[in-house]
């Protein structure tokens, strides 16, 4: 049980173990038993990393044979611009060996991550595009430069995307799947967010390219390790295609605080991918959520058509900007459209705006600050210690 695990790990700390076991999440976090994310220290070479992984695999195999456990061992490796680590299913003896390796920086327990909430209201009007292109509320016209993100790629890290939907006009492609064996968006969340950031009819960056990165299953849930694997894919894909500096990423998802999740999105942002993330939908301080609490990324809260904070939206000093998130209409899998609400809907407005601005020459690394400068100070009751600035395309 988690209580026993906490005592067990406290014993490690008392023994002055070289690596730190990071406590993360909040009281409602859903931990995945015996699953761990291991992060190596900066400067550990590729050769040393491979040697460590091989050693851990051997230790796990020995311990499994000795004790007859059903642990699976090493599951996946990460390398995001030399930020190296892995995810595995290990027994306590193997975990102790990992924590005592001087090359390991920290270990944290894997946890469940979910889409950042949604409410569906069929037939509600669409208003977000008009709002982010006017200083005053009320316009239904979306005014934008016709470049509209041309030459920029947006990675949708979500439940998958219906890449054949008519709203994408052939600009969407499949990337990878770290969630399950079904490369379809059975939920609809990922298709909706992609349509918001780059749909022809419903999107901000109407000419941007779209990549489907499935990290959440049909019930809208996944794991921190799966999210990191998806981010790892995005950075490596952008690097291989030579589009670092011409790419954005949207993560309309979240879980309890995770240093590994925050470190992964920070590496992606620093590599030259503009990262927009949902603040979360619990009407709580976003500092307790990841990746929303990562300082390097653009954390987005949700606003209503009346320029008020959406009742569900998280808030706090880590929020960078507000964007429309209540009653947003966009594409659904199989054709047509539907309406959803959530910070999940606000974040892709910012991801799309990021791609739009990158297409006009903006640097992804400083883009969140630029968006905050352009934003309209319009939000009523934004929340304690929270910005009142609403996304605007300048």
Swiss-Prot record:
<keyword id="KW-0378">Hydrolase</keyword>
<feature type="glycosylation site" description="N-linked (GlcNAc...) asparagine">
    <location>
        <position position="250"/>
    </location>
</feature>
<dbReference type="GO" id="GO:0004252">
    <property type="term" value="F:serine-type endopeptidase activity"/>
</dbReference>
<feature type="signal peptide">
    <location>
        <begin position="1"/>
        <end position="17"/>
    </location>
</feature>
<dbReference type="GO" id="GO:0006508">
    <property type="term" value="P:proteolysis"/>
</dbReference>
<comment type="similarity">
    <text>Belongs to the peptidase S8 family.</text>
</comment>
<feature type="active site" description="Charge relay system">
    <location>
        <position position="344"/>
    </location>
</feature>
<feature type="propeptide">
    <location>
        <begin position="18"/>
        <end position="116"/>
    </location>
</feature>
<comment type="function">
    <text>Secreted subtilisin-like serine protease with keratinolytic activity that contributes to pathogenicity.</text>
</comment>
<feature type="domain" description="Inhibitor I9">
    <location>
        <begin position="36"/>
        <end position="115"/>
    </location>
</feature>
<dbReference type="InterPro" id="IPR015500">
    <property type="entry name" value="Peptidase_S8_subtilisin-rel"/>
</dbReference>
<keyword id="KW-0732">Signal</keyword>
<dbReference type="Pfam" id="PF00082">
    <property type="entry name" value="Peptidase_S8"/>
</dbReference>
<feature type="active site" description="Charge relay system">
    <location>
        <position position="158"/>
    </location>
</feature>
<dbReference type="InterPro" id="IPR036852">
    <property type="entry name" value="Peptidase_S8/S53_dom_sf"/>
</dbReference>
<feature type="glycosylation site" description="N-linked (GlcNAc...) asparagine">
    <location>
        <position position="100"/>
    </location>
</feature>
<keyword id="KW-0720">Serine protease</keyword>
<keyword id="KW-0964">Secreted</keyword>
<dbReference type="GO" id="GO:0005576">
    <property type="term" value="C:extracellular region"/>
</dbReference>
<feature type="active site" description="Charge relay system">
    <location>
        <position position="189"/>
    </location>
</feature>
<feature type="domain" description="Peptidase S8">
    <location>
        <begin position="126"/>
        <end position="394"/>
    </location>
</feature>
<dbReference type="Pfam" id="PF05922">
    <property type="entry name" value="Inhibitor_I9"/>
</dbReference>
<dbReference type="InterPro" id="IPR010259">
    <property type="entry name" value="S8pro/Inhibitor_I9"/>
</dbReference>
<dbReference type="InterPro" id="IPR034193">
    <property type="entry name" value="PCSK9_ProteinaseK-like"/>
</dbReference>
<feature type="glycosylation site" description="N-linked (GlcNAc...) asparagine">
    <location>
        <position position="306"/>
    </location>
</feature>
<dbReference type="InterPro" id="IPR023828">
    <property type="entry name" value="Peptidase_S8_Ser-AS"/>
</dbReference>
<dbReference type="InterPro" id="IPR050131">
    <property type="entry name" value="Peptidase_S8_subtilisin-like"/>
</dbReference>
<keyword id="KW-0645">Protease</keyword>
<dbReference type="InterPro" id="IPR037045">
    <property type="entry name" value="S8pro/Inhibitor_I9_sf"/>
</dbReference>
<protein>
    <recommendedName>
        <fullName>Subtilisin-like protease 4</fullName>
        <ecNumber>3.4.21.-</ecNumber>
    </recommendedName>
</protein>
<keyword id="KW-0843">Virulence</keyword>
<keyword id="KW-0325">Glycoprotein</keyword>
<keyword id="KW-0865">Zymogen</keyword>
<dbReference type="InterPro" id="IPR000209">
    <property type="entry name" value="Peptidase_S8/S53_dom"/>
</dbReference>
